[in-house]
């Protein structure tokens, strides 16, 4: 990554923030969890307390509302689910062009792993982190780490 890419990433990050996140049961649309917090801040590990029933759902709809001052040509994210630091799952999502000085909502559906691959909540609790890297094309904007606790 060249210095121009780095300065572009820094410029975008300064004007980028997550306003809220919502997780819904993808089948019923019912809200499972909502947090009005900027999870994009890269300087510390965030925490989320999510109802344990999320582990029983076939699919979860994730809604991210974010604001940006800078435009982005190809906004995308790479999301890794880690258990005790080891990658369990990895997903790639692409939103595309995002205009300058806008607030946007991005909704995507995440399907559950097969039941045979699921671990109980007591094993997962506090041991799972979600590492999300936000990009404009190949330029890293920010990286967020959220530790999950099941309640």
From Swiss-Prot:
One cellular-component annotation, GO: nucleus
Pfam family, one: GMP_PDE_delta
Localization (cell): Nucleus; Cytoplasm
Domain of life: Eukaryota
InterPro entries: Ig_E-set, PDED_dom, PDED_dom_sf, Rhodop-sen_GMP-Pdiesterase_dsu
UniProt cross-references to Gene3D superfamilies, sorted A to Z: GMP phosphodiesterase, delta subunit
Signal sequence annotation: none
Key words, A-Z: cGMP, Cytoplasm, Nucleus
Biological processes per GO annotation: sensory perception of light stimulus
Family according to the record: Belongs to the PDE6D/unc-119 family.
Protein name: Probable cGMP 3',5'-cyclic phosphodiesterase subunit delta
Organism field: Drosophila sechellia (Fruit fly)
Upper classification of the organism: Eukaryota, Metazoa, Ecdysozoa, Arthropoda, Hexapoda
């Amino acid at each position: 990554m060249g210095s121009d890419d780095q300065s572009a990433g820094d410029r975008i990050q300064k004007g980028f923030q997550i306003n809220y996140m919502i997780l819904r049961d993808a089948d019923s649309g019912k809200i499972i969890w909502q947090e009005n917090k900027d999870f994009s801040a890269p300087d510390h590990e965030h925490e989320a307390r999510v109802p344990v029933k999320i582990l029983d759902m076939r699919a979860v709809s994730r809604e991210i509302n974010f604001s940006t001052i800078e435009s982005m040509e190809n906004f995308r994210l790479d999301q890794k689910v880690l258990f005790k630091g080891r990658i369990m799952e990895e997903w790639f999502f692409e939103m595309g062009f995002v205009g300058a000085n806008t607030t946007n909502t991005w909704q995507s559906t995440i399907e559950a792993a097969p039941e045979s691959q699921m671990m109980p909540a007591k094993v997962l609790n506090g041991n799972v982190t979600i590492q999300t890297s936000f990009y404009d094309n190949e330029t890293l904007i920010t990286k967020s780490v959220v530790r999950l606790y099941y309640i």
